């Protein structure tokens, strides 16, 4: 795949932004509820894509949810509970910068959940997502990946750029060494039953 020129990129971006604004207006007018999950490897471009999507949109209609590490209280709750209050209302788009799939990604690979908790997630997630779909939520899921070499290059660039260092946490640096362990995660994300139905 070849890169497009900057001029062509800007031209295409303008066209797509107009379409996004039209889509937003249609969602608002029809009272639709749209939840978009952005998952993937660190430095794969999730944040950049979310930024490009939200820039032309009305923040009263489209919002981003990027939850921090769960509190002790949240850890004691039903796993999906912390996400439920952020789900979209009629006429709203919610973009999740990471989601409940943290359980099968970061939490599993980094040892933040037990094997039993992970297995329960794999059983419960399709049921939870079916509940969302039956309630009228349009659920869209994206998985972003990047090669081991490209991830290393992007991490290095972030370390060198003071304006981007906030994007790297000690956990990101630790997880960098587990690139191979994250590989099966994308398969899990893409093959849970609701993914074929969404």
Q: How does the language model describe each region?
A:
Residues 1-12:
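Charged, amphipathic alpha-helical linker segments immediately N-terminal to NTP-binding catalytic cores
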Residues 21-27:
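Pre-Walker A adenine-sensing motif
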Residues 38-53:
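Glycine-rich phosphate-binding P-loop
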Residues 60-70:
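Short beta-strand-centered segment that lines the nucleotide-binding/catalytic pocket of NTP-utilizing
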Residues 70-73, 99-102, 145-152:
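Conserved nucleotide-binding/hydrolysis micro-motifs of P-loop NTPases
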Residues 74-117:
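Conserved nucleotide-sensing/catalytic segment adjacent to the nucleotide-binding pocket
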Residues 108-122, 132-183:
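A glycine- and Lys/Arg-enriched "phosphate-lid" helix/loop adjacent to the NTP-binding pocket
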Residues 188-194:
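Conserved small/polar residues in nucleotide/adenosyl-binding loops
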């Amino acid at each position: 795949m070849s890169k497009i020129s900057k001029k062509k990129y800007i031209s295409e971006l303008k066209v797509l932004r107009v379409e996004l604004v039209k889509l937003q207006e249609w969602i608002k007018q029809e009272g639709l509820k749209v939840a978009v999950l952005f998952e993937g490897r660190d430095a794969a471009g999730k944040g950049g894509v979310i930024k490009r999507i939200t820039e032309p949109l009305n923040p009263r209609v489209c919002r981003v949810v990027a939850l921090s590490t769960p509190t002790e209280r949240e850890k004691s709750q039903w796993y999906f509970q912390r996400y439920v209050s952020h789900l979209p209302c009629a006429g709203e788009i919610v973009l999740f910068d990471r989601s409940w799939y943290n359980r099968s990604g970061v939490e599993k690979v980094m040892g933040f959940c037990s094997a039993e908790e992970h297995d329960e997630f794999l059983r419960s997630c399709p049921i939870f997502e079916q509940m969302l779909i039956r309630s009228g939520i349009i659920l869209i899921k994206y998985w972003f990946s990047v090669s081991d070499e490209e991830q290393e290059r992007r991490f290095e660039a972030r370390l060198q750029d003071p304006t981007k260092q906030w994007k790297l946490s000690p956990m990101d640096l630790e997880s960098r060494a587990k690139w191979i362990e994250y590989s099966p995660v994308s398969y899990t994300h893409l093959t849970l039953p609701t993914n074929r139905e969404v």
